[in-house]
From Swiss-Prot:
Reactions this protein catalyses: cytidine(1402) in 16S rRNA + S-adenosyl-L-methionine = N(4)-methylcytidine(1402) in 16S rRNA + S-adenosyl-L-homocysteine + H(+)
Annotated S-adenosyl-L-methionine binding sites: G35, G36, H37, D55, F79, D101, Q108
One cellular-component annotation, GO: cytoplasm
Higher taxonomy: Bacteria, Pseudomonadati, Pseudomonadota, Gammaproteobacteria, Enterobacterales
Compartments where found: Cytoplasm
Enzyme Commission number, as recorded: 2.1.1.199
Organism per entry: Shigella flexneri
Main location: cytoplasm
Cited InterPro entries: RsmH, SAM-dep_MeTrfase_MraW_recog, SAM-dependent_MTases_sf
Pfam families: Methyltransf_5
PANTHER family: 12S RRNA N4-METHYLCYTIDINE METHYLTRANSFERASE (PTHR11265:SF0), S-ADENOSYL-METHYLTRANSFERASE MRAW (PTHR11265)
Name under which the protein is recorded: Ribosomal RNA small subunit methyltransferase H
Length: 313
């Protein structure tokens, strides 16, 4: 079933070019998906190069296992644990580049059975890995109204979070929701002001998906681990699709591109300053898709690619 889904990788060349591939380098594709980035990386590696791919989606793992290449290996798990995967392989400080393509993929959105989309009726699941954790339906049936409202406001930036949360809880008391169409209808009915350019359930589905998959915590942990695993000169190439993701990436790169913040006038010797360490990253800027790519793939419209390089500090 999954092979029927056409998937166009957003900012494909730009993200891989951002890694500045060395033929003998060791790279991580933290979000294998359907393998667009991984295949391009492999095409640029020599015989000594290595690529470690990660994904927590079983369908992505099935696709990855079709790649017969001794330079390639796949791990079924969250990219937040990349530090552990690298340590297990004795590669700490030896990784030449990490690529992350954040958020939900087109095949996940387009497969109604995964429950990510309000446009297609399916089980109200939304898990990146359907074998682990609570589904969206299970969480919405057991969560407090205040907690649902907080999630919708925090992760969906939903203006009517309290009203929608109340409607969800009331509906689940009457009859537990198990389908995406049911949730979309409840949200639409509870939304007093409609945006003619956006479905009223858009923010709610984004928020619940982010919460169910701990997406923002996953990003923060992966970024933190990247500083430890990257070799000097190693690159970070990260694509985000909404402001919450991009804010985390931007802040991380900005904070680690600065040297130690020492209060003005505080007496410190040169030796003490050295112990504080220097900046750990050099931000190399951001890229956004061009008009042609957006025309071919409208989902690319909101994407942002940020690139940074590990320093010697």
């Amino acid at each position: 079933m999954m092979e029927n889904y056409k998937h166009t990788t957003v900012l494909l060349d730009e993200a891989v070019n951002g890694l500045n591939i060395r033929p003998d380098g060791i790279y991580i594709d933290g979000t294998f998906g359907r393998g667009g980035h991984s295949r391009l990386i492999l095409s640029q590696l020599g015989e000594e190069g290595r690529l470690l791919a990660i994904d927590r989606d079983p369908q992505a793992i099935a696709v990855a296992k079709t790649i017969d290449d001794p330079r390639f290996s796949i791990i079924h798990g969250p990219f937040s644990a990349l530090g552990e995967y690298v340590a297990e392989r004795d590669l700490i400080g030896k990784i030449d580049g990490i690529l992350l393509d954040l958020g939900v993929s087109s095949p996940q959105l387009d497969d109604a059975e995964r429950g990510f989309s309000f446009m297609r009726d399916g089980p109200l699941d939304m898990r990146m890995d359907p074998t682990r954790g609570q589904s969206a339906a299970e969480w919405l049936q057991t969560a407090e109204e205040a907690d649902i409202a907080w999630v919708l406001k925090t992760y969906g930036e939903e203006h009517f979070a309290k009203r929608i949360a109340r409607a969800i809880v009331e509906r689940n008391r009457e009859q537990p929701m198990t389908r995406t169409k049911e949730l979309a209808e409840v949200v639409a009915a509870a939304t007093p002001v409609k945006d003619k350019f956006k479905h009223p359930a858009t923010r709610t589905f984004q928020a619940v998906r982010i919460w169910v998959n701990s997406e923002l915590e996953e990003i923060e942990q992966a970024l933190k681990s990247s500083l430890n695993v990257l070799a000097p000169g190693g690159r970070l190439s990260i694509i985000s699709f909404h402001s919450l993701e991009d804010r985390i990436v931007k802040r991380f790169m900005r904070e680690n591109s600065r040297g130690p913040q020492v209060p003005a006038g505080l007496p410190m010797t040169e030796e003490q300053l050295k112990k504080l360490g220097g900046r750990q990253l050099r931000a190399l800027g951001k890229l956004m898709p061009g008009e042609e790519e957006v025309a071919e793939n409208p989902r690319a419209r909101s994407s942002v690619l940020r690139i940074a390089e590990r320093t010697n500090a």
